[in-house]
UniProtKB/Swiss-Prot annotation:
The keyword Cell inner membrane does not apply. It comes from Methanosarcina acetivorans (strain ATCC 35395 / DSM 2834 / JCM 12185 / C2A). GO terms for cellular component: cytosolic large ribosomal subunit. One of its GO terms (biological process) is translation. The gene is rpl14. Part of the 50S ribosomal subunit. Forms a cluster with proteins L3 and L24e, part of which may contact the 16S rRNA in 2 intersubunit bridges. InterPro entries: Ribosomal_uL14 (IPR000218), Ribosomal_uL14_arc (IPR019971), Ribosomal_uL14_CS (IPR019972), Ribosomal_uL14_sf (IPR036853). This is Large ribosomal subunit protein uL14. Disulfide bonds: none annotated. GO terms for molecular function: large ribosomal subunit rRNA binding; structural constituent of ribosome.
Length: 132
């Protein structure tokens, strides 16, 4: 997993319910915790674009519901700044279900994906139809 070039604000708290935008059968997932999050004692973990999270499937097909999986944040509403000075924000918050290596479990991703995610997880970048 590569480092991020941008300083991404962590806008998604643990407990946030977010749309899943791949074709795995999950529709809404809830963030349980954030992988490699280093915070202060008793602070709730937060996630931003490109962070891998442990999630629980809240809505979706009966086979997918109540499963605990890994997912990567591909879009967030909170604006962030790229090194070239461009400010980027999306219309919604979205995640893609992956495995430990960051390879997506689905074969299709709906909507755009941030360029930072495509750089950090190349397999998500190849699966995405639009990279912003």
């Amino acid at each position: 997993m590569k480092g991020m070039r941008s300083n991404i604000p962590r806008a998604l708290n643990a407990g946030a319910q977010i749309a899943c935008v791949d074709n795995t059968g999950a529709k809404v997932v809830e963030i349980i915790s954030v992988k490699k999050y280093r915070g202060v004692k008793n602070r709730m973990p937060c996630a931003g674009i490109g962070d891998m999270c442990v999630v629980s499937v809240k809505k979706g097909t009966p086979e997918m519901r109540k499963q605990v999986l890994l997912a990567v944040v591909v879009r967030q509403k909170q604006e962030f700044r790229r090194p070239d000075g461009l400010h980027v924000s999306f219309e919604d918050n979205a995640m893609v279900i992956t495995d430990e290596e960051g390879i997506p479990k689905g074969t299709d991703i709906k909507g755009p994906v941030a360029r930072e995610v495509a750089e950090r997880f190349p397999k998500i970048g190849t699966t995405a139809s639009i990279i912003v």
